[in-house]
Amino acid sequence: MGQCLGLVQIDQSTVAIKENFGKFSEVLEPGCHFLPWCIGQQIAGYLSLRVKQLDVRCETKTKDNVFVTVVASVQYRALADKASDAFYKLSNTREQIQSYVFDVIRATVPKLNLDDAFEQKNDIAKAVEDELEKAMSAYGYEIVQTLIIDIEPDVHVKRAMNEINAAARLRVAANEKAEAEKILQIKKAEGEAESKYLAGVGIARQRQAIVDGLRDSVLAFSENVPGTTAKDIMDMVLVTQYFDTMKEIGASSKSTSVFIPHGPGAVKDVAAQIRDGLLQANAERND
């Protein structure tokens, strides 16, 4: 923009307001214009057509009595075909826009709870934009876009909200941990049950093998040693198992103190108890 010898240069995205003896004459477009000052023609001012941005911070209170600071960002520009209105009708465009933003936000946010205000930021921005568009179009301005870029609660409220969120996340984590431990316990119990079942099967097979071996031993001994009875053979087997048991107990490093009769005569008592039990069982079966 410049003026020399009545020639005026107007830059791109800018218009100039031409007056003749102080009265509005016309809007000059970008380019070079001739204004003979001697006949009262002059430039009253310039108006940029670029998009401008205004950030407005508005403090208000929500429906649940929480004080918040709402930060709105308004993008606006002057209209070339209404440049005279934009130049003459408003003395301070930014203050005018700020006043309308304050009015709409303070009329909208108090109707919402804090959580709803966060969720409905776009609705608040739309309400502000509609009101600004309706009001500022009469002054030659266009509202390009309005955004609610932040809602800042009071510091103490923000800290409380963070603590609530942290507690909720800890509760979820605790539930997940408990569920995982529950699954581990179930799997462990299933494994122990399967292990005990297999151990029982193994013990049953072992005892069956022992019984089969004893039977074969008794039959073979009675055939090879004439004059022996089944009682003699069982007594000898019991003595052998008795000493094998004492040997295993003594050889084990994890065995505790076990007090059992150590004399060979104790085997006779054990054999007698076994025989008495078998005879009693047979008697009851015959009755």
From Swiss-Prot:
Pfam families: Band_7. A lipid is attached at G2 (N-myristoyl glycine). InterPro entries: Band7/mec-2_domain, Band_7, Band_7/SPFH_dom_sf. Keywords: Lipoprotein, Myristate. It comes from the Eukaryota. Positive regulator of hypersensitive response (HR)-like cell death. May be involved in potassium ion channel regulation. This is Hypersensitive-induced response protein-like protein 2. It comes from Oryza sativa subsp. japonica (Rice). The gene is HIRL2.
